[in-house]
Amino acid sequence: VGGKGSDRWARKHDTIFFYSKTSKFYFDGKAAGVKRDTGTKSTGGIIRTDENGRLYQDKLVKASGKYYRYYLDEPKIPEDWWTDINSIQSGSDERVDYPTQKPEALLERIIKASCPINGLVFDFFMGSGTTLAVALKNKRRFLGSDINLGAVVTATKRLTQLLQDSETGLHVFNVN
């Protein structure tokens, strides 16, 4: 999906903003790593096996003359553009029919990379509660807020179903 127009570029992406209060922030790119693309011989280098049976590629950076070894069983830190996460399909189990709902895989990558286990995730525009649900599934604490009562109801229902009989301390507050 995305905006189409004859007078501008088609808008086919979302932008994720990454903010930190200080220069000391949590980032674990390998926790959100993606499978390495081995490419072709010309782009990825020759795949070899080391003395322990692990597959790797050596890559030469021509500008510096340095070689780097990348093991294929280790995840690669993703770039800042992702094409490996698909939109939510109409028959998907995670779909809650909320108009701005994002795929859980997208939020999982962001949360794993930017919040430690037992850390706190805050979604100021929680919508359907996807961010909060993914935080819960990945052992992070969470806070959510939304001005839209429908969003609060949708997110609360989703989290309640996910939690079922757990003793969690889930509270919903109306501040209007």
Residue ranges of predicted features:
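Core catalytic lobe of class I
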Residues: 1-166
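Extracellular/periplasmic ectodomains of large secreted or surface enzymes and adhesion receptors
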Residues: 164-176
